[in-house]
């Protein structure tokens, strides 16, 4: 479930690439990627992002309106699988505003529809507790980059509900995106090392959000954790991560 500023016509390749990466990484936990299907749900009107009407991101109505449709879509996937005798693990991942939208949908979806729910860089959980989700106990997850993602929990609790990091009974996945080629060190070190004055000004203003879009980047521990859950596994252990990095020649 994508973020603010998402448009099917301009962002399709980005999400196709993300989907392929998530599929490929399931091989690290012994799953054949050819047995994995990934979907980017773009059938909702997302608030505009930077360069557009950014104030729309403060409006919860976009999430409220989209949540029932997402819930019905997920129920349709499950019903189709059941009708055709296909058993599958269904994992929903929501990023930023999309995680709040998905969270609201998970309170409405029929039980037995979704097996795992992951929120990353979340404005708010769309619920006050994991008990409100129609998700099996122990199968709700969150991922939060420690630096450069001030979006986490930014939405007011009265509308966006609890910051996922503070939800009881939630499983915390890795927030490590330092292996992303897009990862930046927030604060003075990064600004001092950029050589373009105008870029410096932009980075100072945007520093709190520099790493908000790095969760799904190829090679990150966050995206590997997501792939593990998709494959029905657990988050990446330190030993497994070391083995992956050795395989990649790091």
Regions found by a protein language model. Give the residues of each.
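Short, hydrophobic alpha-helix immediately C-terminal to the catalytic nucleophile
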Residues: 103-107
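Lipolytic serine-hydrolase domain surface
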Residues: 3-88, 108-250
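Gly/Ala-rich beta-loop-alpha elbow adjacent to hydrolase catalytic centers
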Residues: 93-102
């Amino acid at each position: 479930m994508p973020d603010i500023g998402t448009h099917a016509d301009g962002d399709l390749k980005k999400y196709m690439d993300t989907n392929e990466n998530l599929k490929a990484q399931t091989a690290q936990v012994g799953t054949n990627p050819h047995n994995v299907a990934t979907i980017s749900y773009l059938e909702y009107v997302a608030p505009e992002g930077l360069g557009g009407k950014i104030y729309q991101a403060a409006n919860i109505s976009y999430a409220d309106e989209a949540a029932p449709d997402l819930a019905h879509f997920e129920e349709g996937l499950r019903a189709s699988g059941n009708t055709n005798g296909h058993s599958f693990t269904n994992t929903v991942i929501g990023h930023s505003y999309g995680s709040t939208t998905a969270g609201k949908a998970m309170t409405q979806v029929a039980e037995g529809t979704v097996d795992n729910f992951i929120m990353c860089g979340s404005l708010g959980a769309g619920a006050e507790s994991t008990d409100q989700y129609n998700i099996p106990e122990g199968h709700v997850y969150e991922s939060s980059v420690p630096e450069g993602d001030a979006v986490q929990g930014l939405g007011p609790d009265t509308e966006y509900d609890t910051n996922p990091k503070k939800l009881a009974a939630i499983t915390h996945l890795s927030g490590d995106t330092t292996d992303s080629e897009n990862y930046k060190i927030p604060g003075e070190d990064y600004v001092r090392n950029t050589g373009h004055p105008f870029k410096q000004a932009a980075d100072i203003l945007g520093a709190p959000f520099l790493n908000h879009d790095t969760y799904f980047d190829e090679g990150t521990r966050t995206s590997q954790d997501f792939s593990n859950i998709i494959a029905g596994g657990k988050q990446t252990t330190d030993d497994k991560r070391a083995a992956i990095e050795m395989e990649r020649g790091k």
